[in-house]
Amino acid sequence: LAGLAAFRWNEITRMTEICWKDREEGFRPMTDRDEGTLWSRINKQQKPMRFADLRLVLGSEFVPVYHPFKAYFYGLPRWQEGDADYIKQLAETVTLADASPEARNTFCHCLKKWLVAMVAGFLTDRVNHEILVLIGKQGIYKTTWFHFLLPPELRNYYVAKNNSRRMNKDDRLLMAEAGLICLEEIVTMTDEEVDQIKAAVSLPQVVERAAYARNKEVRPHLASFCGTGNQVKFLTDLTGNRRWLP
């Protein structure tokens, strides 16, 4: 097997990924066709092997564990005192209704707290309890701004959700498999939907059985939440709006 391809088990997606040694491509999720090709090549080039045995090996410690977020962030150069304030530069890409320096500083402060909490959620067992919301008219690239927050290496872990009416099993699993979940047009959410989102944001873990899995798993809550809308007064909860940063 090692002579044919490299393998890794994605701790977030719970999928085995493959990188063929005779192809000019990187790692990608393994497909049924990949398994069939491996089995065929092994039987042609070496000695006969049962297909069931191949699957047992690919599901064992033979395949090393890979955490995409830890691999990315721990591979970055360490920020040093005197380096550019990249979060401040990012904050300046957002046009504020209030152009005063005080409003700009407040937004930069909130953005920094939210981003730090998001990265902490990627690397530790901490959970980001706040939801950053961009409010403005349609067509000004609010959702696009959130989409490009994740670097290209992690962009597959961004999910845009435009129907928040039901927090079902798949949505809960997303909290363990996505890095950033964007709630589009949050103004359409009812009070019940807002309560569901607030409860989901604070969950420390996700306990669900994934499709085709035999048992339930306790998985860390990885995802941070963000949202977009076109009305400032989108919340009607009189008990407080602590989780939202509009």
Where are these regions (language model features)?
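Alpha-helical scaffold elements adjacent to nucleotide-binding pockets in ATP/GTP-utilizing enzyme cores
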Residues: 145-148, 192-200, 243
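AAA+/SF3 P-loop NTPase mechanochemical coupling elements
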Residues: 171-176, 210-228
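Walker B catalytic acidic pair
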Residues: 184-186
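Conserved ATPase-coupling elements of RecA-like P-loop NTPase cores
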Residues: 189-195, 237-238
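Conserved catalytic/switch belt of AAA+ P-loop NTPases
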Residues: 194-217
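A short helix-turn-beta junction within AAA+ P-loop NTPase domains corresponding to the substrate/partner-engaging
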Residues: 235-246
